[in-house]
Design a protein with these regions (language model features):
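Extended, H/D-rich, highly charged conserved domains that either
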Residues: 1-25, 39
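SIR2/sirtuin-family catalytic core signature
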Residues: 31-154
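Active-site-adjacent structural elements in folded domains
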Residues: 25-31
Length: 154
C-alpha cells in the first residue's frame, strides 16, 4: 500500500494540515533504507527521480559516497535508469544538490552509471553492455551450489 503525504520538514500552516504528514498517518511505517544503502555493494534506481519527496532518504548515502576520505571498501556501484536526457539532467541537478556540489567525487569514488531507457542506442553503449554482462555473471554465480554453501557458513 502507498501512503501519500508531505514530509516532516514541510510547514503545515500551524499544524492545520498535520494530517497530511506521512509520519503522522497511523498506517505509516518506514523501512530503514539508510541501513540497506550503507550495506549494499550495488544500488540500482529504476525510474526514480530522486526528487524532493524522497530526498531525505537518499541524501546521507550520496553525501557519504562523495567524501574525500572514502575508503576503497566503501566504493559502491550506483546505477540509475531514467528515461531521457532531460530526466538525466534533473537527476544530476538533484545529486549535485544532495552532495554539496561534489558530483565529480561521486563519479570518482564509485562506479556510477546513469542509463536512459529511451535512448535507442542504449544497448550499444559499452558501459551498459559491461553493466549488463556483470549482472548476468552475478545471476549465474548465485545459482551455484558454492554460493549457497558460502551463505551457510554464516
Amino acid at each position: 500500500s502507498a501512503i501519500l503525504g508531505i514530509n516532516d520538514q514541510v510547514s503545515t500552516i500551524d499544524g492545520a494540515f498535520d494530517f497530511m504528514r506521512k509520519s503522522f498517518n497511523p498506517y505509516y511505517s518506514s523501512h530503514p533504507v539508510s541501513y540497506d544503502l550503507k550495506e549494499a555493494d550495488e544500488v540500482v534506481f529504476f525510474g526514480h527521480s530522486l526528487g524532493d519527496n524522497d530526498y531525505h532518504y537518499f541524501q546521507p548515502f550520496f553525501r557519504r559516497q562523495c567524501e574525500e576520505d572514502l575508503e576503497l571498501k566503501e566504493k559502491r556501484t550506483i546505477t540509475i535508469f531514467t528515461y531521457n536526457e532531460n530526466s538525466r539532467m534533473e537527476i544530476m541537478r538533484t545529486l549535485h544538490k544532495m552532495n554539496g556540489g561534489k558530483t565529480s567525487l561521486l563519479f570518482q569514488n564509485n562506479e556510477l552509471n546513469i542509463f536512459c531507457t529511451g535512448d535507442s542506442r542504449l544497448e550499444e553503449s559499452p558501459s551498459f553492455r559491461k553493466w549488463y554482462s556483470d549482472r548476468i555473471t552475478e545471476i549465474q554465480r548465485v545459482r551455484t551450489q558454492q554460493f549457497f554453501d558460502d551463505i551457510a557458513k554464516y
